[in-house]
C-alpha cells in the first residue's frame, strides 16, 4: 500500500463538542467524519481498523462453533408486537413506514428476527444446539448521541443467539461464549475485565459484561487482586465481615448544632468516619424503614430493591420523615424509645459497636450506641452498599475500583422470546418443547473507540498491533530527489509484505516532521525512515510507536525487530 494512492486526511482542528480523547483523535486522524447527529462516515483509514476488529471477532466466533448469518436491519412491526417490545422498547426504537403504510423498525437488536428464523427452520431436538451470529449495522435513536462512535445512533455490532433444548445445554454454551470473548479481547490487545452484572430489563439467569479499562469509562468496576473476580459496582460484593465488636461505651447525647453530614460529625467528634452510621429513610409497599450504612459507604439501590418487599422503594420525603421520626434529614437515627422503627442494617453496620447515629433531634447525635442495649436487633441484615477501594474481597484479595467501557455482554436469556414467539421443537418423545436461548453481543465499532481511550498519548493513537491500520510505515525522505531512495524503500516494502507484515509506504513527499506526526497520530506501531544519509551508512532509522527511542539499524536487524 502506498499513501500516495490512499486517501489519508489528518487535521489539527476538532469540534468543540468532541469531549472524549477517542472522538478527538478519530476526527484528527481522519478515521471518521460526522454526517448527522450520531451518524458517522468511516473513512478508508477508519474502515481498515474496523475490519481488523471484525476479522478477529469472526475468527474466534467461527472457532467456537458459531455460524455466521445476516438478518435484515429493517424488521416488521408484527414481530416486535409478538415479543411485546414494539411499545416497551421506547423512543430508541426508530419506527418507519413504507409506501403502503406498513410499519417497520430499524433494528437495534435482533432477538425477534432470529427467533422467527429459527422457529421456521428448526423442528427437531436433533437440530439443536445452534449458535447463529451476525456482524451488522444497528440503530438506536439516542436522545443525546455523544462521544463520537462511543455512543452513536448507528453502530456496528456482533450479535449472536444460541438455541437449546434445555438449561444445562444453555449453560454449556454460555461458558463457551465467555471463554470465546476472553480470547477475542486478548487478541485485540486490550486490558479488560469480565464482570458480573445485573441482568436488568433483558432478564435471564446469568449476565456478564466485558469492559475495557479506561479512565473515561462510564461504568464503575470492582475487581480483586486475589483472582479474576470482577463485578459491576452495582453487583460487586465484599467479604462477609467478622463477628460483632465488643461494646465498651455508654450511650450519650452530644451537641452537633450544624453538623448534618457524616464527615462533619466525625470531624467534630474527632473519630474515624467508619464509626458514624448514616440513616437513610425509605418508603416501601409495606411502610417506612431506616436503611443503615457506615458513614464511608454509599447505598446500592439495586441491592436494596432486591430485598423482599423493597422492589418499589423510594426515599422518604421530609413530611414522611417528620411524621415517623419527628426530625429532619441530617439528624435521623434508629434509636427511638417507645416508637419502634423497622431497620435494615447493612452487614457492616450489624457488627459495629459503640457507633454514632443521629438523635432524631435537630442539632444532636448519639454516641456509644450498641445493638440490643440501645436499640433492638435489626429486622433485616443484608449487603446493601457499594464496595469501596481496599475492601476485603471474597477470595481474600483486596478490592480495586476502576472505570470501564462496556464492549461486550453475554446473557442467559432463557425462554422469554421463545415462549412469546412460540419457538418450539419436538423432543425425543415427540413432545413440543420451548427452546431456551442465550444472547451474546460485542460492540465492534465501540471497540475501536475504547481501544483509543486505553491506548493514546499527546501525539495520538497507540494501536495494539492486532488492530493497527498497518503494522509498519516506511517513510521516504525526499523521494523525488534521488530515485535510489525510492527504490530502496520499494525493496523494503516488498520484503516486509512477503513476510506477511502489513506495511504502508509513505511516498507523499511531505516534510519529515509532517510525515512523522501523521504516523504518530494514526498510531502505526513501527516507523522506518529511508533516507539518503541512512542508505549511505547502510542503516534505516527505526522507532516503535510506544517508545521515544530512535535507532539506526541494518536491514537484517531491522527485519528481525519487526518480525519479533
Curated annotation (Swiss-Prot):
Consists of three domains: the N-terminal catalytic domain, the editing domain and the C-terminal anticodon-binding domain. GO terms for biological process: prolyl-tRNA aminoacylation. InterPro entries: aa-tRNA-synt_IIb, aa-tRNA-synth_II, aa-tRNA-synth_II/BPL/LPL, Anticodon-bd, Anticodon-bd_dom_sf, Pro-tRNA-ligase_IIa, Pro-tRNA-synth_IIa_bac-type, Pro-tRNA-Synthase_IIa_type1. One of its GO terms (molecular function) is aminoacyl-tRNA deacylase activity. It is found in: Cytoplasm. Keywords: Aminoacyl-tRNA synthetase, ATP-binding, Cytoplasm, Ligase, Nucleotide-binding, Protein biosynthesis. This is Proline--tRNA ligase. Gene3D superfamilies: Anticodon-binding domain, Bira Bifunctional Protein, Domain 2, YbaK/aminoacyl-tRNA synthetase-associated domain. It catalyses: tRNA(Pro) + L-proline + ATP = L-prolyl-tRNA(Pro) + AMP + diphosphate. It holds the Pfam family tRNA_edit. Homodimer. One of its GO terms (cellular component) is cytosol.
Amino acid at each position: 500500500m502506498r499513501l500516495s494512492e490512499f486517501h489519508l486526511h489528518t487535521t489539527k482542528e476538532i469540534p468543540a463538542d468532541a469531549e472524549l480523547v477517542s472522538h478527538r483523535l478519530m476526527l484528527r486522524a481522519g478515521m471518521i467524519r460526522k454526517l448527522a447527529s450520531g451518524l458517522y462516515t468511516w473513512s478508508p483509514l477508519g474502515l481498515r481498523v474496523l475490519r481488523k476488529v471484525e476479522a478477529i471477532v469472526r475468527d474466534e466466533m467461527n472457532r467456537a462453533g458459531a455460524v455466521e448469518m445476516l438478518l435484515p436491519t429493517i424488521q416488521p412491526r408484527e414481530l416486535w408486537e409478538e415479543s411485546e417490545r414494539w411499545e416497551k422498547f421506547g423512543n430508541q426504537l426508530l419506527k418507519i413506514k413504507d409506501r403502503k403504510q406498513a410499519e417497520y423498525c430499524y433494528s437495534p437488536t435482533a432477538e425477534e428476527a432470529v427467533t422467527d428464523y429459527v422457529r421456521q427452520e428448526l423442528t427437531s431436538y436433533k437440530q439443536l444446539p445452534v449458535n447463529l451470529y451476525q456482524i451488522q449495522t444497528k440503530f438506536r435513536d439516542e436522545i443525546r448521541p455523544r462521544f463520537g462512535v462511543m455512543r452513536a445512533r448507528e453502530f456496528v455490532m456482533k450479535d449472536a443467539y444460541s438455541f437449546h433444548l434445555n438449561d444445562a445445554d444453555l449453560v454449556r454454551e454460555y461458558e463457551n461464549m465467555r471463554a470465546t470473548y476472553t480470547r477475542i479481547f486478548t487478541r485485540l490487545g486490550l486490558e479488560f475485565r469480565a464482570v458480573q452484572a445485573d441482568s436488568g430489563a433483558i432478564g435471564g439467569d446469568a449476565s456478564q459484561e466485558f469492559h475495557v479499562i479506561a479512565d473515561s469509562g462510564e461504568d464503575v468496576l470492582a475487581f480483586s487482586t486475589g483472582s479474576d473476580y470482577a463485578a459491576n459496582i452495582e453487583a460487586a460484593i465484599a467479604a462477609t465481615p467478622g463477628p460483632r465488636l465488643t461494646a465498651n461505651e455508654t450511650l450519650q447525647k452530644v451537641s452537633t448544632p450544624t453538623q448534618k453530614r457524616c464527615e462533619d460529625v466525625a470531624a467534630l467528634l474527632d473519630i474515624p468516619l467508619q464509626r458514624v452510621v448514616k440513616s437513610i429513610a425509605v418508603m416501601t409497599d409495606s411502610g417506612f424503614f431506616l436503611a443503615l450504612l457506615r458513614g464511608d459507604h454509599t447505598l446500592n439501590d439495586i441491592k436494596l430493591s432486591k430485598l423482599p418487599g423493597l422492589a418499589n422503594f423510594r426515599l422518604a420525603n421530609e413530611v414522611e420523615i417528620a411524621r415517623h421520626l419527628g426530625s429532619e434529614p441530617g439528624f435521623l437515627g434508629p434509636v427511638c424509645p417507645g416508637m419502634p422503627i423497622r431497620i435494615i442494617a447493612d452487614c457492616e453496620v450489624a457488627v459495629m459497636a459503640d457507633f454514632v447515629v443521629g438523635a432524631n433531634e435537630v442539632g444532636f447525635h448519639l454516641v456509644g450506641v450498641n445493638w440490643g442495649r440501645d436499640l433492638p436487633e435489626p429486622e433485616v441484615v443484608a449487603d446493601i452498599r457499594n464496595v469501596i477501594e481496599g475492601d476485603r474481597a471474597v477470595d481474600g484479595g483486596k478490592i480495586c475500583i476502576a472505570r470501564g467501557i462496556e464492549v461486550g455482554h453475554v446473557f442467559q436469556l432463557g425462554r422469554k422470546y421463545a415462549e412469546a414467539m412460540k419457538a418450539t421443537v419436538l423432543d425425543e418423545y415427540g413432545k413440543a418443547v420451548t427452546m431456551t436461548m442465550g444472547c451474546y453481543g460485542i460492540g465492534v465499532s465501540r471497540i475501536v473507540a475504547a481501544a483509543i481511550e486505553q491506548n493514546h498519548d499527546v501525539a495520538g493513537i497507540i494501536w495494539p498491533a492486532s488492530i493497527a491500520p498497518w503494522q509498519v510505515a516506511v517513510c521516504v525522505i525526499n523521494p523525488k530527489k534521488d530515485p535510489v531512495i525510492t527504490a530502496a524503500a520499494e525493496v523494503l516494502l516488498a520484503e516486509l509484505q512477503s513476510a506477511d507484515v502489513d506495511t504502508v509506504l509513505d511516498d507523499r513527499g511531505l516534510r519529515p516532521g509532517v510525515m512523522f506526526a501523521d504516523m504518530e497520530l494514526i498510531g502505526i506501531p513501527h516507523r522506518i525512515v529511508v533516507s539518503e544519509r541512512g542508505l549511505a551508512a547502510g542503516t534505516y532509522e527505526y522507532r516503535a510507536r510506544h517508545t521515544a527511542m530512535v535507532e539506526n539499524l541494518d536491514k537484517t536487524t531491522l527485519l528481525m525487530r519487526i518480525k519479533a
